[in-house]
Amino acid sequence: VKVKLEPTTNISVSAISSAGSGENLKLMDEGQIQFGILQGLYGAYAWNGTGPVPQAYKNLRSVSMLWQNVEHFVVRNNVVETGTISDMTNLYDESFSIGARNSGTEGSGRFILGKVGIDLEQVDIAYLGYGPSADAMQNGNIDGMNIPAGVPASAVTRAYANLGGEITTLDFTEAQLAEVNSDFELWTPYLIPAGTYPNQDKDINTIAQPNIMAARADVPEEDVYQITKTIYANLAFLNNIHPATKAMALEKAIAGLPMPLHPGAARFYREQGIEIPERLIAE
């Protein structure tokens, strides 16, 4: 966006690193950032004022669905029985990285595992980011890790390259997916074909939730319009920068959005012939 938009408009965009969805919500609410990437789950929490968020964030608007956050629950083969997420019970008294503390990764991991009946009080929880989780798996310090990310996830690639036949990414059955979706219809089945990761010799049947771009409601309509337009006019350019953006497409732009669209984004989508459902029209 910065490369394509700044030379022709007065819109300047700069990226910052954060601890993820939870911190992005806080920074947007405080006005320190105008745009942020949120997991779909955190977007639903934020709009409804439920879960771990302290309030309903009614000053937020959706801009676009980005790519899907694909759940990778990677464990050592010695705990695998069924090959599904229910095998997480075999990690009781073992060490598992849930993600960085207070991150969206931790939040969604706890939500999913709670929904399928896994008691995390019985698991020795480590709070590690993606790279450190892969390192800890390789070093034998943990027995599993939670990596929700676009495919291919670099931490999972590293784990499979180094541990190959010693690890498994757990599947989800239709019944388990229904349990996860009992509060919010966010997750969908996601197939990771064999060969996506090094030494991965069979398909992985996991689930995914949308990652969304959100904006403060007070960002000018024209700015959001230009940014949204620039994103979709330059998808091929984005694909070369980040492989996860290859999953983006205009026809998926409003799928799974948990809060109303910013009027600037809505204007662009209407121009493209996309019908916007009533629930996504900001009052």
Predicted regions and their residues:
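Sec-exported extracytoplasmic/periplasmic mature domains
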Residues: 2, 6-10, 29-33, 48, ...
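Short, glycine-/small- and polar/acidic-enriched structural segments
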Residues: 1-93, 100, 169
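Pocket-lining segment of extracytoplasmic ligand-binding domains
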Residues: 40-42, 50-52, 77-79, 119-219
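Extracytoplasmic/secreted proteins, especially bacterial periplasmic and envelope-associated proteins
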Residues: 4, 23, 27, 32, ...
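An extracytoplasmic/periplasmic, membrane-proximal ligand-sensing/linker region
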Residues: 132, 149-164, 169, 222-283
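Ligand-binding clefts/hinges and TM-proximal coupling segments of bilobed small-molecule sensing domains
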Residues: 87, 92-111, 183-257
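General small-molecule cofactor/ligand-binding pocket signal
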Residues: 14-16, 124-126, 170, 277-279
